């Protein structure tokens, strides 16, 4: 972004000047969110700010950001439909994400080859039962490395729901009612309990560690890891010895054939004070 800002300032020298400030954000949203909230209260918001996807509607409803009314259809056409949908509130576009995100089931090709495991294609993902059998096959291979079949963590903040939402959805579960107003009977549904118990089976069978082990997959001591799309770049740049593959997410034995993945991204928006 610094390069883009420098190019902008060079192009519009003497007419406009842009500056950029990077503010760290922790897993619970603190730091950056605290700074923005304080700026809202003081009326000192910057002209352009980044907004996390789930917060766009609230920012728009409260008049913190303004519609991007001057964008043409041609300009909007270069963005994914999911990005346009994320940034739209009450039929008005308020924010645009520079990227999209999703999750993947990452695997170590060398470990799976040694265990004699073949990876299915996107149209025929492993079911829960099938994946359990796969974990059973790879466990002896990773035990020789003092590792686990699965590098699966449940971090605080938003990451846990983001990573594992497809498990719940493929089993017919959800987190809130369709109108967004109810949790009881939805979050604690029979389907969601089945999903949580499936996670528990990984611990019960010793396929994952009971405590988080840093870089377990990246160090070649785990066969699988569920993570975001950003993990690919991290592994390629920092762990080049990992023979990385990406498999479709595991689906429930009761899978209805639907495709489920979380999406969403930080987006750019213009504050309401911007002219």
Role assignments for model-derived ranges:
Residues 10, 14, 115, 193, ...:
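Extracytoplasmic/periplasmic substrate-recognition and gating elements
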Residues 30-44, 62, 112, 132-137, ...:
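Short helices/loops that flank or line small-molecule/ion binding pockets
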Residues 132-137, 173, 178-210, 249:
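Glycine-centered hinge/linker elements that transmit conformational signals in sensory
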Residues 104-107, 168, 268-270:
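Short glycine- and hydrophobic/aromatic-rich loop-to-beta-strand nucleating segment
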Residues 110-123:
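Aromatic-glycine-rich donor-binding/catalytic loop that engages nucleotide-sugar donors
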């Amino acid at each position: 972004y610094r390069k883009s800002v420098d190019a902008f300032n060079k192009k519009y020298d003497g007419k406009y000047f842009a500056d950029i400030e990077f503010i760290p954000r922790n897993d619970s949203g603190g730091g950056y969110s605290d700074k923005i909230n304080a700026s809202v209260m003081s009326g000192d918001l910057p002209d352009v700010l980044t907004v996390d996807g789930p917060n766009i509607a609230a920012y728009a409803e409260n008049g913190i950001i303004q519609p991007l009314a001057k964008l043409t259809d041609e300009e909007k056409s270069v963005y994914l439909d999911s990005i346009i949908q994320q940034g739209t509130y009450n039929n008005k576009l308020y924010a645009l994400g520079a990227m999209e995100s999703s999750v993947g089931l990452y695997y170590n090709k060398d470990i799976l080859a040694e265990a004699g495991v073949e990876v299915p294609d996107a149209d025929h993902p492993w079911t829960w039962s099938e994946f359990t059998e796969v974990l059973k096959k790879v466990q002896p291979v990773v035990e020789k490395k003092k590792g686990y079949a699965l590098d699966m963590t449940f971090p605080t903040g938003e990451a846990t729901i983001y990573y594992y939402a497809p498990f719940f959805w493929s089993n017919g579960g959800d987190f809130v009612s369709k109108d967004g107003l109810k949790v009881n009977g939805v979050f604690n549904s029979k389907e969601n309990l089945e999903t949580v118990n499936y996670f528990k089976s990984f611990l019960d069978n010793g396929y994952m560690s009971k405590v988080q082990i840093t870089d377990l997959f990246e160090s070649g001591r785990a066969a699988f890891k569920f993570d975001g799309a950003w993990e690919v770049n991290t592994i390629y740049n920092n762990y080049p010895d990992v023979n990385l593959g990406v498999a479709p997410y595991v689906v429930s034995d009761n899978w209805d054939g639907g495709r489920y993945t979380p999406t969403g991204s930080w987006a750019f928006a213009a504050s309401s004070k911007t002219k």
